[in-house]
Amino acid sequence: MELMTVLLPLAALVSGVLFTWLLMKGRFQGEFADLNAQLAEKAARCDFVEQAHAEIASELAVLDGKYRHLQDENYALGNRFSAAEKQIAHLQEKEAESVRLKQSYIELQEKAQGLAVENERLATQLGQERKAFADQYALERQIRQRIETDLEESRQTVRDVQNDLADVGNRFAAAEKQIAHLQEKEAEAERLRQSHTELQEKAQGLAVENERLATQIEQERLASEEKLSLLGEARKSLSDQFQNLANTILEEKSRRFTEQNREQLHQVLNPLNERIQGFGELVKQTYDKESRERLTLENELKRLQGLNAQLHSEAKALTNALTGTQNKVQGNWGEMILETVLENSGLQKGREYVVQAASVRKEEDGGTRRLQPDVLVNLPDNKQIVIDSKVSLTAYVRYTQAADADTAARELAAHVASIRAHMKGLSLKDYTDLEGVNTLDFVFMFIPVEPAYLLALQNDAGLFQECFDKRIMLVGPSTLLATLRTVANIWRNEQQNQNALAIADEGGKLYDKFVGFVQTLESVGKGIDQAQNSFQTAFKQLAEGRGNLVGRAEKLRLLGVKANKQLARDLTERANETTALSESLEYVAEDEAV
């Protein structure tokens, strides 16, 4: 009963709690459903916003691309508009020329029929130009319409004046000649621009060469400084060793030398000092020569820096030579270019190369033939290189001025044939048999115009081999300059080798002299030792031992021998002491014997 009393309230409490929980659960579920609905709505809105944002971003990207495309089109249209304005100006010039022709046509009305055909050709040409301009500038409609209007007006003007044309054929022919002349001038201007481009390339090449030479000069300077440093250290080391050795020997023997021995030693040392001074002079001369060579290289670098300015004047001279027809003038110009290359190669005129050196050659019939090569380049070991300048430019000039491919091919063949003819003529001279000249097995044939030289080799692959078979080497300015610079370096190395041999020879002589000096000095020392031993023996006989000369002489004085001089006291005392000591030793020896 009591249990029921307790359980009933508890059950009621539990029921209330469950009921309350169910009510709260239903409320919470409703609120949770509302929250889920709100979240779903917000998620849908977010998706919509993101989709809209993506669409806006896509549209912005498309608009940005269109904007850039429009900018590019605007830039292209601007360029085309500028080009069209230039064409319009050109057409306006042509229109002005048409007006001038119209005035000429009005003045000369008798030959209208002859000009009609030409006017039709001009109209056709203008139509072709109009079509080309229309195709090229399709986007510029207003400009195209203006061009078409101008062309139509020009054609109408031409048609209006056709009935009034007179003696205009000659004038129009003159105009055609003038146009052809202008075209030639334009072609010449194009060639000059190409020449200018080539000169700029050469200038760039020279700049690279300048940098290379500067690097080479710096390397040679460092090598020379290192050599001089080593020579200076060797000289200082040898001098210190000689001085230390001489001082050591002199310090050991100085207390034994007499005035006569010192004089003899000076006589022995003087040749050694002279050799050392000669070695120092040789080192100084080597340093001065290296300094002069560095100065020569610096001057050469300055000349190379000024070569760009010289090329401009040489280009003008080249133009005059190309347009000239006198072979003598072209030959002189080729020799001038050859001498310019030689001057810039670093070789010394008159010493390492000779210009226009005359010589003779014996013929098979017993006679002699006088030959005069343009340049003889001397090599070490009494060898020479023969260089002969050959200018072959007439056909080359016509080739550069050719109006069509057939003419160009014909003139190119003539240019190669001209070079081959020069080569055959040079091979007949046979410079290798000149008296007093020890040439190599081949001769350099110098072509002063680099493009003409390269053009011939590029279009005739067998030309170089044919020249080589005839012991002729084809060279242009660049290849010859590289070869001559190599020869200059060979001469510098030869001079340095000769200096090194001279230094080695002087060093060998110095070493031999030093060995002789040491041997002589050893002999002097031995002689001094022998003299010292003889001196000690003689001194013992004089003042030491029993019966020495000083004691005997002093006894004679004490016995009454008349003398004007007297021996030194310390010498007589020493003689008496040694005599007494000797007698005492003899007495002791006798007592021991007894």
From Swiss-Prot:
Keyword terms, alphabetized: Coiled coil, DNA recombination
Any one biological process term the GO annotation gives: DNA recombination
PANTHER family cross-referenced by the UniProt entry: DNA RECOMBINATION PROTEIN RMUC
A family per Pfam: RmuC
Protein name, entry field: DNA recombination protein RmuC homolog
Protein family membership: Belongs to the RmuC family.
Domain of life, per lineage: Bacteria
Coiled coil: 31-330
Protein function: Involved in DNA recombination.
InterPro entries: DNA_recombination_RmuC
